[in-house]
């Protein structure tokens, strides 16, 4: 994964002839840096505890690597000898309450790349050129698609997808750095401008190596782990059979797929790596079930019955039915 970070940094520095600021901050951050200083509205759904891992009222595990940018920008604003053109490189693990499938994990690796320049303005054409450089560097020969998107900390934003066969796969987002984000850090937006980009490193590495299961990136099996040291195509170790289990559970009305995924991870602890995916097959409100059925499930009147399909598969061995049960 570090090879991707290095390749992207070198490609952009060669193109822009700018200086570099590397950030590798601690994952516990202030809510202000993760949300407020990036212009997230106080009522943003992203702030809800079902999506964010709070440590206390004002502290949290960062939900994106963009949380490193406010402090990076403040440091730039305080530096009397700051360079006129700087690429901020901020990789790291992020922490989310997310659904479980072959492309998602609750602790994804991300990378923020922000170009901050004093003097000449930066426009959407500059942003488009940045996207092209990034995609050509990490996924040579792969076509990308830009879709208008809104992000609190940018203007004129895009979502970045790449074409994989007949489908699109999202790899990141970008935009022009929001003037208020710059101003809040002590950088006068009349004198400074920026290009902001956030990328999913796990997703990029999977696409580069031809990996279809995100758990392989963290596999302990030496046959798998040894292949994560370079960018050559992945050679499958073996194909293990999946085991499916359907669970009928009582939950509060409106419990999201992300909540269910987080509960599965918490319940299984170290065995959570065996879960390939979870999917809600059906939702039935208590009012639609007989009293006998509600009693059997232990379903209260203000709850709903969820039929949850859990697919278990180890990346390096065959699971026994006893283990799965």
Set out the residue ranges of the language-model regions.
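Amphipathic alpha-helical segments
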Residues: 3-15, 126-139, 259-266
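Short secondary-structure junctions
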Residues: 12-19, 81-82, 135-143, 267-278
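Long, well-ordered mid-to-C-terminal structural blocks that present hydrophobic/aromatic surfaces
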Residues: 113-114, 118-119, 123, 136, ...
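Extended C-terminal subregions enriched in glycine
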Residues: 122-158
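A carboxyl-terminal module marker
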Residues: 150-325
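Class II aminoacyl-tRNA synthetase-like tRNA-binding/catalytic domains
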Residues: 1-104, 116, 168, 173-182, ...
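Long, charged, glycine-rich C-terminal linkers/tails
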Residues: 18-33, 144-151, 276-280
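Glycine-rich, often proline-containing surface loops adjacent to acidic residues and nearby aromatics
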Residues: 57-58, 105-115, 242-248, 305-309
